[in-house]
Amino acid sequence: MVYYPERFVWVSQEPFPNKNMEGRLPKGRLPVPKEVNRKKNDETNAASLTPLGSSELRSPRISYLHFF
């Protein structure tokens, strides 16, 4: 299995679907590497910082982050 951090894609060498799956996705959650969790937390923390010289106390709203 290969992980591409810049694309957020998991690639597996196993054929899909296999006999156990019978055309369905496997039960349970897919593995999420720690790098993705750490990056997501870092982006969230950075997004909540206010710009220097700003008196604004609320966090800015981010509309370009899409989670799926």
From Swiss-Prot:
Chief site of localization: cytoplasm
Listed InterPro entries: Neuronal_3.1 (IPR024417)
Pfam families per record: Alveol-reg_P311
Domain of life of the native organism: Eukaryota
GO cellular component, one term: cytoplasm
Biased composition (Polar residues): 44-54
Keywords linked to the UniProt accession: Cytoplasm, Phosphoprotein
Ranges for region Disordered: 21-54
Cellular compartment(s): Cytoplasm
GO biological process entries: axon regeneration; regulation of neuron differentiation; regulation of transforming growth factor beta receptor signaling pathway
PTM text: Phosphorylated on Ser-59. Phosphorylation decreases stability and activity.
Function according to Swiss-Prot or TrEMBL: May have roles in neural function and cellular differentiation. Ectopic expression promotes axonal regeneration, induces differentiation of fibroblast into myofibroblast, induces myofibroblast ameboid migration, augments motility of gliomas, and increases retinoic-acid regulation of lipid-droplet biogenesis. Down-regulates the expression of TGFB1 and TGFB2 but not of TGFB3. May play a role in the regulation of alveolar generation.
Assembly information from the UniProt record: Interacts with the latency-associated peptides (LAP) of TGFB1 and TGFB2; the interaction results in a decrease in TGFB autoinduction. Interacts with FLNA.
Protein name as it appears in the record: Neuronal regeneration-related protein
Organism: Macaca fascicularis (Crab-eating macaque)
